[in-house]
Each structure stands twice: as C-alpha cells, then as structure tokens.
C-alpha cells in the first residue's frame, strides 16, 4: 500500500470507531494488519476481538453485566490504539518523512540511551561548564557543548519518534520533571518533543505527563506544556472521552478555574497567530513601502540643531511631516498590534531561516541560549562591547526564540564596522536605559511573564509550521479552524461566560462575524446576554446579510438599552435592506431627533420616503442635505429623480445638468434622458441615451437598465409604443 491508501484505510477505521461500529472496525483493522508484519499488534487485536465476542454472547444470553459499558469503552479504546500503531507501522515502510526515518532508525540506538541515562548526562552539564570556565581559555568547552547538545538532540528525537511510551518510559519522564539539576532549556526541549509525538499519535502516558508538566514550577516549562495540551486536543478532539481518568485530571487541574483561564489565553494566542498573514501583508504592502517613500522627507527635515541643547524640546515640524505622511497612523496600528501580542516580526525574520542551524527540526524548539555552541562560536562565551548590548536586547520578550537565533546569525555575518554603526543608531539615552540595572531588570521581568513566554512559544511554533524545510510533512494547525471551546473534554473548562466572551470579542474585533456570532449565541443560550452582546450578535448577523435575525437581536438590545443611537441606526439599516421602508423610516426619524444633521441619516430617511412614493417629503430631506453639504452629488441625484417622478421636470433637469457638469455616471445620462424626453426634447434625449449606452459599455446593458425604468416612463406620460422607436434612435 502507498501512503495515501494507508491514510484512507486508517481514516475509514477511525470513522467506524467514532460511530461505535466496533465489529466492523475490528474486521477492517484485521484486513489492515495483514499488510503489516507486526505480530504483537495482531495479537492485541485478536484479544480485543475475542473479548468483544464474549461480551456480545453474554448480552445475547441476557446476562446482566453492570460493567458492560466500561468494558465496551476499553475494547473500543484498545482497538483504536492498535489502529494508530498499525498506521504508523505501515507508514514506516513507505513514507519518506523525517519522522518515519527516525522511527526506522530507533532500533539502532543503544539500549542504554533511555530517558534516565540521557538525564544523567544532561544533569552533569552545569557543573562541567563551571569547571570549564576555570580552565585557561575555557579548555574543553567545545567538546562539552557538543556532548550536551547531542545528548539533548538524542532525547528530543527518541521521544518524538516513540509513539507508545511504556510504564518505564513514563516513570523516567517524570524523573525529568522532578530533577533539580536538569537545565531548564533541556526540559523545555523535551516538552516540545512530547507535544510533537502526540501530534503524530495519541498516547495517554504522554498526555498525562503534560498534565504533570503544567504544574511545574518553571514558567518556561509549564507554558510549553499548556500549549502542548492545546495542540494535542486540537489534533485529537474526541479522543479524551475514551479516557475518564484523563478528563478527571483536567477537571481537577481546573478546580479553582485558573487552568481554564490559562488555557483560554493560549486559545487567544493561537487565534491571534492566524492573523499573522494579514499583518505580514500589511507590513509588506503598506507600512514598509510608506516608510521607504518617507525616508527623504524625514532625512531632509530641520532637526532643530539651533535650539538650546539643554531643552528636551522636539521640533513640531517632525510631527507634522510624520502625521501628514499617513505613516503615523500605520505605525501606531502596528504598535497596538505588538502590545496585544500580535506577531509583527514574521515578515522581517521569514527570510532569515536559511542558516544551517535551522536545518535540524529540534533547533526550532530550543529556547534561546547565549551559551549554545552556535552563539558562542559567533560572539564568544562572555559577550563584551557591542555584543553585550545585543545580549541585553535578546533578554527582552520582544522576539521569539527562533528570531533571536536568526538575529544573532545575521549580526554575526555583518562586518564589525557596520554592526557598530547599526548599534550606534541607538541614542546614548537608549543605551543608558538598557544598561540601567532597574530598567534591564524590568525588561527581564516582562520576558518572564507567563503570557509573554507562551505567546513567543506560539510564534516559534508558527515559524516551524510555516518556514521549516520539512513543513510540508506536518499537519499545519494554523491553517485550520481553531475552536478549543468545542472540544468535548474542555466543555466544562472553557464554556464559561467570562471566558467565552473574550473569544467572541476577539473574533468580533478581527472581523470574523460567523465565528463571533456562534459564541454570542452560546452566551445568549447561557442567559449571559446584555445589550452589548445583543448589539454585537445583531451586527454579526447584519454582516452575514441575515437581516431579519439581526433585527430581532437589535430589538432585544433596544429593550435592554433603550434609544441607543447605534442600535436605532442599525435597525433602520436592516429594515431598509429587507425593503420594509416604513419601519426603516420610523427608526431613521428617531436617529434624526438625536443627530439632526447626520448626512447619512438625512439621505436614507429621504430614500425611504421616496421608496414609499412620498416624494414631497423626500425632497425636503434631500434639499436639507444639499444645504448642509456643499456639492453633494448624491443629494442632487435624489432631487433629480424625485422631481422627475413627481412631475417637476424643470427642477429635475436643473439638477441633472449640475450632475452632468460634475462627475456623471451612466445612470445620470439615462435619467437626464428620461427628463429630456418627457419635456419633448427628443434629440437631446437620444443624445443623452447614447452617452449612457457608451458609459454602460454597450447596448445590451443599456437596454436592460432602460427596461427597469419603463413602467415609470409610462406613468410619466411616455407612450409605450414610442419606446422601441427611441431605442432605435440611440
């Protein structure tokens, strides 16, 4: 079987298991396993089949078994686990993916390369490093770093490729969490390996280990574990229902609600990462080109050197030029995005992932470390001068780990003179701030915040799935819908009003009306709705063009918060969209009472009156709009049309002539032609109709648009029999 056939057959078996068609699933799995030489798996399946056959026989005999449902769940779970391992076993034989090459090479690893043995090597690193520092010229440092990094690499790869931990593996992995000597970076890397392994294949022992890791004292570790849990559940959304002990542990973790709040934060960070492509596009197409266009303006400005140097007074010309260029708004927008945790550096660093360091998958997950051999090679063991400044910058929480490595490698490849010049662009005030102990301490504290750590880790993952050489070998969760609150195991944890509202509002702010609406509806069903929620639900429905439902939501908002101008205005709009012009007019008049000179309100109130054929009243609104807004062409168009259908032809032509002298559209020539024809100016009418046909792009569209006005023309006294003749004049 090829890869596609294996995946399809596996998915078919899983679909049967999800539908609880266990007997069929076992039969299909038996056929699936005939293609594999894995006898232990065949034995496991045979045992599961035998147990199920006995269970069915007892049921047929009417034997009451209070443990029947529990046993059924266990057999179904075992069948699913066998299917998982069978899939991997078959793929190992045909797939060229890195993961399967690792699995095929696992047998070559010496047996002493277990977790506990590797742990001892890693634990010895801090002491060995301290000894190296005492030696002249850090003698032996290169060999020590190489041994440490290779050991961490073996632990990462062997953990990732091990799809089914034994009890011994689980106990040894717990030993890593309990160790006080293991370097935190190594534990972080191991946590990522556990997550990657779970993405490939569900393993209860690994998931249980992540639940332990969430309570680890180190923030780097517990935040990685939290993200790992989110990823595991996104990859296997229904799987936890088969393991009551795991769902019970999740509930226990959330006893005080803190786990749910943290997981909800991860949820938002994952959703926010899905906005990265939009931000990247904005950076490439708007902000960077705008900055390039304004380089000369900013460079040629007077920088006020004649001012008293003692005065900290900025030249107002700078701000004016900055704001008038439009760059100010764009940079403020990007600053706001950065402050909320958006990934604003992806476009900058995407091109800097071609260094040899990034060819190895595990390096994408290694926390940034100035003592990593690749960094020491470029900057030395104890950075000084410019490198010390760079080191301070890298301690901040502004860049994710992957980007910090990219920045270092890029700086290392820049000649020293240019590097010095770049860093010299920082003012002495900036440098003093960095060197100032209290301020650098504040930067470190910011970098150590749980939300900053988890957000930067999500950015690391985003880069791995989008930029790594082997990205096509992985399922990219960032391309899929992320809806953690819908996962059954998280229902009691995340489906709480105070958490759902944050997700709903995120989708609302990012203009995802369908996703926001689903959550607002859920909040309404939980009886947690206020006027604000009904307003937002209405707005989402309006964006989805579900106007009648939007009206229902807005009316409820109006009951809870009466006469709110925003609600009234949107009610008017929705009624107008469903062509209930009488109701729309009623609400426009309410808005008018609050905002008597709102241009849009005047125009749409007049439009509703025109649709209701109350032309005299409509004209009063359009005249008022024309009075308060100079050269208002849309008011002229409305006056022209209302005057025409109301028999005021001279007034109609007066306004159409004003339009034709300004910025006419095809419809303006058409309507002016109607007026000219009705006033007996046949030649002028034909001329105007010809211009309309030209503007419409041909006779076909012109005749279609003309046909829509035919009834109105006849009502105004144009003979229906003359219409074909006029068409031939055009």
PLM region spans:
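Conserved structural position within tetratricopeptide repeats
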Residues: 34, 522-525, 555-559, 589-593, ...
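Start-of-helix register in tetratricopeptide repeats
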Residues: 7, 224, 498, 532, ...
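Terminal, low-structured helical/coil segments at or just beyond the last alpha-helical repeat
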Residues: 698-730
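Alpha-solenoid helical-repeat scaffolds
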Residues: 366-561
């Amino acid at each position: 079987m090829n890869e596609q056939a294996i995946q399809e057959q596996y998915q078919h078996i899983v679909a049967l298991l999800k539908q609880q068609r266990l007997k069929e699933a076992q039969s299909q799995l038996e056929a699936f396993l005939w293609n594999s030489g894995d006898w232990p798996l065949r034995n496991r399946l045979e045992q599961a089949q035998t147990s199920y056959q006995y269970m069915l026989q007892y049921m047929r005999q009417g034997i009451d078994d209070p443990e029947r449902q529990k046993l059924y769940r266990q057999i179904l779970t075992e069948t699913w686990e066998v299917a998982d391992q069978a899939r991997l076993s078959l793929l190992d034989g045909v797939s060229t993916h890195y993961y399967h090459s690792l699995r095929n090479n696992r047998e070559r690893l010496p047996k002493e390369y277990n977790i506990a043995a590797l742990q001892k090597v890693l634990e010895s690193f801090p002491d060995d490093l301290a000894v190296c520092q005492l030696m002249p010229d850090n003698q032996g440092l290169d060999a020590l770093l190489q041994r440490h990094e290779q050991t961490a690499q073996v632990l990462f790869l062997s953990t990732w490729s091990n799809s089914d931990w034994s009890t011994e593996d689980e106990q040894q992995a717990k030993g890593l969490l309990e160790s006080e000597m293991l370097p935190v970076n190594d534990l972080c890397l191991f946590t990522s390996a556990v997550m990657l392994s779970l993405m490939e294949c569900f393993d209860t022992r690994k998931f249980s280990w992540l639940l332990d890791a969430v309570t680890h004292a180190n923030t780097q570790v517990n935040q990685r574990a939290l993200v790992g849990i989110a990823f595991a559940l996104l990859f296997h959304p229904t799987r936890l229902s088969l393991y009551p002990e795991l769902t019970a542990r999740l509930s226990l973790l959330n006893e005080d609600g803190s786990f749910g709040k943290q997981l909800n934060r991860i949820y938002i960070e994952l959703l926010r990462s899905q906005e990265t492509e939009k931000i990247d596009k904005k950076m490439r197409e708007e902000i960077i080109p705008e900055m390039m266009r304004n380089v000369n303006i900013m460079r040629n400005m007077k920088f006020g050197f004649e001012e008293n140097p003692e005065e900290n007074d900025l030249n107002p010309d700078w701000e004016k030029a900055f704001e008038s260029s439009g760059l100010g708004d764009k940079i403020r927008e990007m600053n706001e995005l950065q402050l909320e945790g958006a990934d604003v550096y992806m476009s900058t660093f995407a091109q800097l992932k071609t260094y040899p360091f990034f060819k190895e998958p595990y390096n994408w997950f290694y926390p940034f470390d100035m003592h990593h051999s690749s960094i020491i090679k470029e900057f030395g063991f104890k950075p000084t001068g410019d490198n010390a400044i760079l080191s301070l910058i890298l301690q901040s929480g502004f860049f994710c780990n992957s980007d910090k490595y990219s920045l270092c490698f890029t700086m290392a490849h820049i000649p020293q003179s240019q590097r010095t010049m770049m860093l010299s662009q920082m003012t002495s005030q900036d440098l003093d701030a960095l060197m100032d102990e209290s301020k650098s301490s504040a930067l470190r504290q910011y970098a150590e915040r749980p939300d900053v750590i988890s957000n930067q880790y999500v950015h690391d993952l985003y880069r791995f799935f989008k930029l790594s050489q082997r990205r096509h070998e992985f399922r990219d969760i960032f391309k899929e819908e992320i809806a953690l609150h819908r996962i059954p195991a998280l229902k009691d944890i995340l489906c709480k009003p105070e958490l759902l509202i944050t997700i709903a509002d995120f989708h609302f702010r990012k203009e995802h009306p369908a996703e926001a609406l689903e959550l607002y509806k859920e909040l309404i069903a939980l009886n947690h709705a206020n006027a604000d929620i009904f307003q937002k639900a209405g707005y989402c429905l309006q964006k989805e063009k579900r106007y009648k439902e939007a009206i229902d939501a807005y009316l409820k908002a109006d009951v809870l918060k009466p006469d709110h101008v925003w609600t009234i205005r949107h009610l008017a709009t929705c009624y107008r969209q469903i062509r209930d012009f009488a109701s729309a007019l009623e609400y426009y008049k309410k808005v008018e009472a609050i905002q008597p000179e709102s241009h849009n309100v005047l125009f749409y109130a007049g439009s509703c009156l025109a649709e209701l054929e109350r032309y005299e009243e409509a004209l009063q609104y359009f005249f008022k709009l024309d009075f308060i807004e100079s050269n208002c062409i849309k008011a002229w168009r409305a006056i022209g049309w209302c005057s025409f259908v109301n028999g005021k032809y001279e007034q109609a032509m007066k306004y159409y002539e004003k339009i034709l002298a300004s910025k006419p559209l095809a419809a303006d020539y058409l309507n002016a032609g109607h007026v000219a024809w009705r006033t007996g100016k046949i030649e002028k009418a034909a001329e105007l109709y010809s211009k309309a046909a030209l503007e419409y792009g041909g006779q076909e569209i012109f005749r279609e648009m003309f046909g829509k006005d035919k009834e109105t023309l006849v009502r105004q006294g144009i003979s229906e029999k003359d219409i074909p003749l006029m068409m031939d004049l055009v």
